[in-house]
Amino acid sequence: MIYDYGYDVIVVGGGHAGVEAASASARIGAKTLLLTHNIDTIGQMSCNPAIGGIGKGHLVKEIDAMGGVMAKAIDMAGIQFRILNSRKGPAVRATRAQADRVLYKKAINSLINNQENLDIFQDSVDDLVVENNTVCGAITKTGITFRAKKVVLTVGTFLGGKIHIGKVSNAGGRAGDQPSNALAARLRSLPFRVDRLKTGTPPRIDRRSVDFSVMEVQHGDNPTPYFSFFSKGKIEHPRQIPCYITYTNNETHKIITDNLDKSAMYSGLIEGIGPRYCPSIEDKVVRFADKERHQIFVEPEGLNSIELYPNGLSTSLPFEVQCNYIRSIKGFEKAFIMRPGYAIEYDFFDPRDLKPTLETKHIKNLYFAGQINGTTGYEEAGAQGLVAGINAAISIDSDKSWYPTRADSYIGVLIDDLITKGTKEPYRMFTSRAEYRLILREDNADLRLSDKACELGLLSKEDQQHFISKKNAIIENIAMMKNTWIGPQTQKARDLEKFLDKKMTRESTLFDLLKRPEIDYSKLQQISELNLNLQDEAVIEQIEISAKYSGYIERQNKDIEKTATLEQKAIPTDFNYSQVKGLSNEVLQKLTEQKPTTLGEASRIPGITPAAISLLTIYMKKTGFIK
């Protein structure tokens, strides 16, 4: 049966990538269908109940700047907020929020259920409609065909998903859900490179069986920060509660070591590679054998939940062993496990087979986003979903495309890393992956991306006005401060010298004075004659950072300008690299396989030398491909 409602875009999967993809597509105005195997699990946090962190918080802020839903949802559902690295520079500060699982899912559903142009249908997708190497729709398990101009696959860990607890294995996309084996087989029949990855989750513990009095208490920040640029004054956070910290010990490690042969990972049952930066507890004990203890964050799953998430204890050991090692940990001596931990293995497809828009190179109008591309984490998934949804929508009746770059966002870094380097392990975002960290800060994500969001129609009128007002206030106040002078031996100078190490000897602008480490905006406000009445903390923050880091920011902007030349030089998709004399066989093979879209992208493919890029540039200039 064909269920034809004239959809422009179909999004398959209702996780974090799917929600952002469907929401972005619908906000742009495309008639969008979200197909999910279970409407009740849309927006579900399958693993840890938290959003953000180092590098990840940057992604959430960027999704928000483009009108996405993740930041607003966590503002509605967050039960503890912290700014990580708050004592360090602004480039590496990151927001992290503990979530109430129930409230988060409720918030996501509220946001997408009120989204115009978006329909939701419950059924598993078993097949794709592909005609002349172009996707035209999706076929569900019950035999319903939905046709559309674009299809976005955001299927998480469901493709060929296999759950492992010790030596017991069963098919599953996550605990309690069936895998998408038919769709996995269909995708394997298409010309994509495919491999297996693994991730895992810890056992959940009944909080009533835990002794918190022997653990370290970890409180959130006060005042409580917001994730979204648009939430303050409109969204009220839920009640805030603490998390706790405990540690493994030698007894814990001995129990794990003595039972390694029973672990699915160490017994050879699991083929896929797990996440390097979120290893299982058995992996930690083996890889860091010299460490006497490992930190465990004891995280509540919600205000009204009795479940605790012991972050740091992901495992594939048998349930009996899980019980033993959990009870060896301080505070967990009488712990009751409510759900066993498990590892899950699943198919992923080589992201080097994708364009920067996340459209596949082999099947036209088909987009991949999330764990199908080899990433791990809600934030990485949401970021990809956003880009895929945008491009699916804006290219319906044209050849328009938009994708972020390494110079304007962490989303750009994420996608560029994936499509140029690929991945052999679950990819996680860190600030260290970005070259231009001082420019790609959490605090200025809206200033970097929201103009484009306005242009694409991704922001609501209210959010658009909020952004424009903030941007104008920053521009106007910086201009005023650059044109306001204080001369020596004036009353203003004498008032200012209370905060300085020495007397002023020359005339300075307020902006130059703000560059000094001992001066901040609040001190300038104390000089009554200056009449500095600005109260908006977000605007003040941008003014201070612009002044204090102006030299570094200027240098990074110059670096970006140098590399922009290569980024702007497009390579045709049918370009014949064998015509370029002097390229080695290795370079020729890699360029032919990956089909980079620009010289900049080509330069970042592992094994592509500067000499090869020079030869390519000379040939393209000589033959008229570039000027």
Curated annotation (Swiss-Prot):
* Residues that span the membrane, as ranges: none
Residues binding FAD, per UniProt: G13, G14, G15, H16, A17, G18, V125, S180, Q371
Q: Give the source species.
A: Francisella tularensis subsp. novicida (strain U112)
Report what the protein is called: tRNA uridine 5-carboxymethylaminomethyl modification enzyme MnmG
User: Which GO cellular component does the record give, naming just one?
Assistant: cytosol
**Which UniProt keywords are given for this protein, alphabetically ordered?**
Cytoplasm, FAD, Flavoprotein, NAD, tRNA processing
- Could you say which cofactors this protein requires? FAD
Q: Which InterPro entries match?
A: FAD/NAD-bd_sf (IPR036188), GIDA_C_N (IPR049312), MnmG (IPR004416), MnmG-rel (IPR002218), MnmG-rel_CS (IPR020595), MnmG_C (IPR026904), MnmG_C_subdom (IPR047001), MnmG_C_subdom_sf (IPR044920)
Q: What does this protein do?
A: NAD-binding protein involved in the addition of a carboxymethylaminomethyl (cmnm) group at the wobble position (U34) of certain tRNAs, forming tRNA-cmnm(5)s(2)U34.
Q: How does it assemble?
A: Homodimer. Heterotetramer of two MnmE and two MnmG subunits.
**SUPFAM superfamilies for the chain:** FAD/NAD(P)-binding domain
Question: Where is this chain's protein located in or outside the cell?
Answer: Cytoplasm
According to its UniProt record, where is this protein mainly located?
A: cytoplasm
Instruction: Mention one GO biological process in which this protein takes part, according to its record.
Output: tRNA methylation
A single Gene Ontology MF term assigned here is: flavin adenine dinucleotide binding
Q: Give the highest taxon in the source lineage.
A: Bacteria
- Residues bound to NAD(+): 274-288
Q: Which family does it belong to?
A: Belongs to the MnmG family.
